[in-house]
Amino acid sequence: MDNKKEFKIFCDESNHLSYKDNLTLCSKVMVLGALKVPSSEVIKINKTIKYLKHKYKYNKEIKWTKLNISQKYFYDELLEFFFSSVHMWFQAILIPDKKNLRHDVYNQGSHDLFYYKMYYQVLRNLIEIDTSIKIYLDYKDTRS
């Protein structure tokens, strides 16, 4: 019987597309993040998030880029839940200015190659020897 600890890693990104000068299309900041959770805790964590959404009548997708003051207490309690949990580990990479990236020099001219290299950097610190890991990547929109 295999006694490895089982974890799920949920990944998401913000503003991952190549930088464009038209600021309505793309921000210059990019973030790639991952949340590691023991498989045995996923249902409990989901229930807590659903409870908070119901409590604060928050029916939309949770998006940090769409915050407004009327949602302050929901996000305060959500952050408190995440940061007080001993069952969640978060790792992220922030690229402060995509205009400074040199894909021609470091990534064979490919923004996509850079994207996957950065995800490797995020994930490598969350994966341990002798554990079973399932990684869930967000759908990668290539057009927005």
Where are these regions (language model features)?
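Phosphate-ester processing/binding pockets and catalytic centers
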Residues: 1-144
